[in-house]
């Protein structure tokens, strides 16, 4: 527990510096985190076999991560570029599958593309949130996933009776899930007050509170789906943790799975409510 608390505190300090400085610092840190996250997920899905050298499918995937962030930093929120990099990666992986057949399996092709979309691409929306005029505030919104997780845990311990997904995650309850969503909305209300007071004084307080309550409501629901997806992948491949990078927490995907999953939704909802 002590190790978990210490590493958690260090993680928070690094987040404050990363999101506070913005620009190339934020992009650089996200790139590094994305590379590790991609590697963890790719290994879990069998794109790269454990304890084996870096294979061509994963090398191409890692190269795509670097290219994606370069494009992101030079063009910003260019959705056409997002689609192009996904298609380019798919074609490259498909070519490897065809011309190296039967060295690589079709599962590795699918896993390489899925890992890229899930970890690096979805996580990169934090950079886009940080690029908003009020990005120093908005970039923190994805971490409502941790608020949701905390409220869900304590609500489940205190009130949990009905299982949410008994096969996939036996300890999760419907009561805990509802508590997590309510905790997320409470955070959204408080965030809305802070946002209207300090980030954008021109925004009406009521509008800010309602906007962020809706954003965090959706985030609270998606956060739990993201957590269950990550758990399902681990169960399917019989692994306990995605990695060991963060002592007491596991890997990047263990700590950021829900954060990653909700970030694109938060970005697009922010475009709608804060335009």
Language-model features: locations:
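Short, conserved aromatic-histidine micro-motifs
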Residues: 200-207, 249-251, 256, 275
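Hydrophobic, small-residue-rich transmembrane alpha-helices and their short perimembrane loops
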Residues: 222-223
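Membrane-embedded alpha-helical bundles of polytopic integral membrane proteins
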Residues: 1-217
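Juxtamembrane boundary at the C-terminal end of a transmembrane helix
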Residues: 268-275
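Interfacial loop-to-transmembrane junctions
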Residues: 235-258
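C-terminal-most transmembrane helix of multi-pass membrane proteins
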Residues: 262-263
């Amino acid at each position: 527990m002590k190790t978990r608390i210490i590493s958690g505190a260090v993680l928070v300090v690094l987040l404050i510096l990363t999101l506070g400085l913005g620009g190339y610092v934020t992009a650089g840190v996200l790139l590094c985190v994305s590379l590790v996250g991609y590697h963890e997920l790719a290994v879990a899905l069998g794109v790269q076999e454990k304890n084996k050298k870096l294979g061509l499918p994963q090398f191409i995937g890692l190269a795509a991560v670097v290219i994606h962030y370069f494009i992101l930093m030079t063009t910003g929120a260019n959705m056409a570029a997002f689609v192009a990099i996904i298609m380019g990666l798919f074609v490259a992986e498909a070519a490897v599958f065809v011309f190296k057949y039967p060295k690589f399996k079709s599962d590795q092709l699918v896993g390489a593309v899925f890992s890229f979309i899930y970890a690096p691409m979805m996580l990169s929306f934090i950079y886009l949130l940080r690029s908003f005029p009020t990005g120093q505030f908005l970039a923190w919104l994805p971490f409502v996933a941790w608020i949701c997780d905390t409220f869900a845990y304590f609500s489940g311990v205190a009130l949990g009776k009905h299982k949410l997904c008994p096969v996939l995650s036996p300890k999760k309850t419907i009561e805990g899930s509802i508590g997590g969503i309510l905790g997320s909305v409470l955070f959204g209300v408080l965030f809305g007050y802070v946002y209207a007071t300090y980030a954008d004084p021109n925004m009406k307080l009521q509008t800010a509170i309602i906007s962020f309550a809706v954003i965090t409501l959706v985030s609270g629901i998606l956060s739990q789906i993201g957590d269950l997806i990550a758990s399902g992948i681990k169960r399917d491949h019989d692994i306990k943790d995605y990695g060991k990078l963060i002592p007491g927490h596991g890997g990047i995907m263990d700590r950021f799975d829900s954060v990653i999953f909700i970030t694109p939704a938060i970005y697009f909802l922010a475009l709608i409510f804060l335009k």
